[in-house]
Amino acid sequence: MYRDASLFRFGTNRCSLKIEESIGENLKNATFVAVSCVWKIKNGKERASMKGKDDVFKKFHESFAKMEGHFHILEQRIPVELQMEYFKYSANVRKENQPPRPLSEEECEMIYETLLNGETEEREEKRHLLSVLATAKSIRAYRLLEEYAQCADPEVTDWACMALMESRIALESEFSDEKQIYISTGLGGKGEKLRFYVLMLSKGKRPFEDYQRTTIEKEFAYSLPQSNCEIERIAVGEQFVELEFLVPVKEDVKRVLDRVINECNQYGDFLSDVYTVTNVKELTQEEIAEIINKDESFKTSN
């Protein structure tokens, strides 16, 4: 059964969980999980909204901790909405089954030639051909998609990446008894790790001192690898810290961040215990400024 999707949407003051099981009957032993989340959370045990049924971090962590199988995470940064559009579209292509699957190597080559030789100029037609190859149940189709993804037309680059991923999952689910789990996020990931963007502010909106900047850089560089996390980017601004890092799928993101923030605050209590985490997109400088200026929780030093 191919499931589309467990979609988590978490906001500052709300938590909603939407599950749809709508596409795919011919892809055995595979699950599609779309995760789109933004949290603003408070370090420690003080925030009531993080309790019981409203503990969105707990729901997020447990949803993956209970999953067993081979995780696939798209490395490219493709909007979740486009990813879900792709899988719904490819489900219809599988259902139509025209030409009948599995496709022969010759059929795959003909489709690929049509993509390359300019006979197809419309974006929708290119999308259709890519989805046909993705659902071909053919190793040759996978190799052709792999080749095309390296030089895809800009208007279908994301679609080609999705087609390549689907083809890989389809083949692995066909030849392996292990469950295949595809995790879709806006920021993507690497291997079996999800990419998160984190915004942390200084306590009381006070500018960081030099020793505090050094402490942040050293503590994060030391602490995060202890949980098998990888820092891709850390930038310490005047009043805020931006972190982009990779986290193992089954790791508790909140626990990891709480621990390193607490360690930093042993040296002067200068990081706010409220921070923002998302796997949708990086925040722009304008969005960061808006958070600093409008969020009441940062207007006091308490």
What are these regions (language model features)?
Residues 121-125, 141, 155-156:
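Positions within the helices of HEAT/ARM-like alpha-solenoid repeats
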